[in-house]
């Protein structure tokens, strides 16, 4: 029983509970070993982790400020957002890599360059054959393509003039200054016209 003395710690604690204010730590009775183990903060934290439902109930009964704190303390679900993100991203088609597009453009450019080089080689060979067919041109003379075409045009005009002047004279066309493809050697004009353009341009006639 209480003796009524102010220094009695149990009575002070009882009065503090009745007046709803905490008892000073200096006047609290000493806790026993078992009570200390229950009151340790580590046990409280472990109890809170093991009993999340109880914590949610306390948060529901608390004030708005404490509810906000409880919302912040709720653990986030790991992997939920990642699974949703992966599910949403799975429907999108992967974009083509920049390296493959650059390689495709480079291959197309290389193919176009190869075709252009082949065309220029064929054209150069054709001009070389035309230059060797022209008379009065030394073999070591370097002519441009334009000069070669001009000489060929003048040479063709000269041959046509010779054919018109010497036609059917002595029964044949004199072959002097005549080279391929104008070796007709006595053929009539009708036979000359029937010679195809391919034979005149691509082969020698005897």
Curated annotation (Swiss-Prot):
Bias (Acidic residues) ranges: 46-56
Biased amino acid composition, Low complexity: 93-102
Keywords: DNA-binding, Nucleus, Repressor, Transcription, Transcription regulation
Region (Disordered), start-end ranges: 1-115
Function: Transcription repressor capable of inhibiting the transactivation capability of TCF3/E47. May play a role in regulating antigen-dependent B-cell differentiation.
A single GO molecular function term of this UniProt record: sequence-specific double-stranded DNA binding
Biased composition (Gly residues): 78-92
One cellular component term from this protein's GO annotations in UniProt: chromatin
Motif (Nuclear localization signal): 71-76
Domain of life the protein comes from: Eukaryota
Presence of keyword rRNA-binding: no
Pfam families: HLH
Expression tissues: Expressed in lymphoid tissues, B-cell lines and activated B-cells.
Domain bHLH: start-end pairs: 107-159
Location of the protein in the cell: Nucleus
Assembly information from the UniProt record: Efficient DNA binding requires dimerization with another bHLH protein. Binds DNA as a homodimer or a heterodimer. Forms a heterodimer with TCF3.
The protein's name: Musculin
UniProt source species: Homo sapiens
GO biological process: branchiomeric skeletal muscle development; cardiac conduction system development; cellular response to leukemia inhibitory factor; diaphragm development; regulation of DNA-templated transcription; regulation of transcription by RNA polymerase II; roof of mouth development; skeletal muscle tissue development
CDD domains: bHLH_TS_musculin
InterPro entries linked: bHLH_dom, E-box_TF_Regulators, HLH_DNA-bd_sf
């Amino acid at each position: 029983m209480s003796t009524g003395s102010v220094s009695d710690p149990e009575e002070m604690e009882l009065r503090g509970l009745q007046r709803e204010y905490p008892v000073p730590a200096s006047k609290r009775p000493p806790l026993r070993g078992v009570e200390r183990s229950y009151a340790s903060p580590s046990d409280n934290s472990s109890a809170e982790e093991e009993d999340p439902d109880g914590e949610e109930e306390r948060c529901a009964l608390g004030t708005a400020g404490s509810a906000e704190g409880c919302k912040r303390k709720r653990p986030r679900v790991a992997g939920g957002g990642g699974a949703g993100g992966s599910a949403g991203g799975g429907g999108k088609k992967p974009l083509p890599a920049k390296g493959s597009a650059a390689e495709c453009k480079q291959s197309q450019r290389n193919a176009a360059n190869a075709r252009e080089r082949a065309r220029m080689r064929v054209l150069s060979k054709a001009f070389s054959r035309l230059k060797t067919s022209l008379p009065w041109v030394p073999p070591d003379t370097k002519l441009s393509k334009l000069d070669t075409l001009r000489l060929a045009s003048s040479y063709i005009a000269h041959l046509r003039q010779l054919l018109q002047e010497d036609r059917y004279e002595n029964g044949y066309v004199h072959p002097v200054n005549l080279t391929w493809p104008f070796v007709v050697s006595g053929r009539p004009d009708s036979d000359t016209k029937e010679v195809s353009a391919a034979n005149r341009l691509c082969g020698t006639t005897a």
